[in-house]
C-alpha cells in the first residue's frame, strides 16, 4: 500500500529546504543577463516569483517552475503540496494559472510505480481545483524523489503585482502562518504529534488562489510568496527591491502552534540556518531563537503583501468574510538602517 511508504526517509532534505541556499544561488546566476526582447516585462534580473511576457496589448504569459522533495510521507498529499507550491508563484504575481506540465524525478528501483501514480494524482487534484489544465510532463529516473510543475498563467500586463514596489506608509499582510519546514523536519524524524502534522499539512495543501484574487481586487502595491528563503529572506527581497524598510511586529507574525517546542527539541532544518547566515545582516531589533521560524524555509507558504492602509483594511475585512486567514504584521517605512526592523 502506498500509504505505508515513508517518502521523507528517502531524501536528504524536505520540501523547499532542499533548495540551493541564497548565497549559492546568487553566485550561480550572477552572470545571467536579461533578454532585450521588448515584450519581456519581468525577467531574470530581479528576485521576482515568475517571468512575465507580453503577447498582446492586454494579455501576458506568466511562466514559472518549481520542484521539491517530499516533506510528508503520503504520496498523494506530497503531489498536491508540490503542485500548490508551484502554482503559488503565478498567484503571487496576480496571475491565473491555465496550463501545467509534470516534472517527476523518480527512484524506480526502490519505489513501486503506484507511488508515482499517487503523486501525479495529487498534483492533478490541485490543478483541477486551480482550474488549470495538465498538458504533459517529463520523468527522469533518479536516486532521490522529486516532483513539481512547470506552470503557465495569464495576466493583464497592467495588473502585474511585483515584489519590488512597496511604498512607505503601506501595511504588511501575510496569509498563512510559518513553520512548515520545521514541522517537516519533525515528520522526517518521526518526532511530531499527529495533530501538528495534520495542521501543517493542511496549510501546505491550501492554494493561494483565493487570497491572490482578493489581493488584486484590493489593489496590492507589492507581493511575493513565502517559500524557500523563509519569511525574512523574502521580506528582505521586497524591502531591498523597493528601497524601503519593513518594520515588523514580531508578536503579530503568525507561527503554527507547536513549532517553538520543536525548535527547543532541535528539529530545525539546515536550510533555516543557511537562511539565517545569509540574511541576518539585514535584520535589526530582535535576534536569536525567536526569529528561527521566520528563517524557516516554507513550502507552499502564504502570500506576503503590502497595501495602502485603507486597502489593507478592506483586504482584512473581506478575507474574514470569505474565511481566509490574514494577519497585518507591520508597516513599510522609508529606508533607514536595515531592510527589516523587528519590534
From Swiss-Prot:
GO molecular function: ATP binding; magnesium ion binding; selenide, water dikinase activity
EC code(s) of this entry: 2.7.9.3
Keywords carried by this UniProt record: ATP-binding, Kinase, Magnesium, Metal-binding, Nucleotide-binding, Selenium, Selenocysteine, Transferase
InterPro entries: PurM-like_C_dom (IPR010918), PurM-like_C_sf (IPR036676), PurM-like_N (IPR016188), PurM-like_N_sf (IPR036921), SelD_I (IPR023061), SPS/SelD (IPR004536)
Entry's Gene Ontology BP terms: selenocysteine biosynthetic process
List of residues binding Mg(2+): 49, 89, 225
Cross-referenced Pfam families: AIRS, AIRS_C
Residue positions binding ATP: 19, 46-48, 66, 89, 137-139
Residues annotated as catalytic: 16
Sites annotated Important for catalytic activity: 19
Textual note on the cofactor: Binds 1 Mg(2+) ion per monomer.
Role of this protein: Synthesizes selenophosphate from selenide and ATP.
Protein family membership: Belongs to the selenophosphate synthase 1 family. Class I subfamily.
Assembly and interaction partners: Homodimer.
Full protein name: Selenide, water dikinase
Species of the source: Geobacter sp. (strain M21)
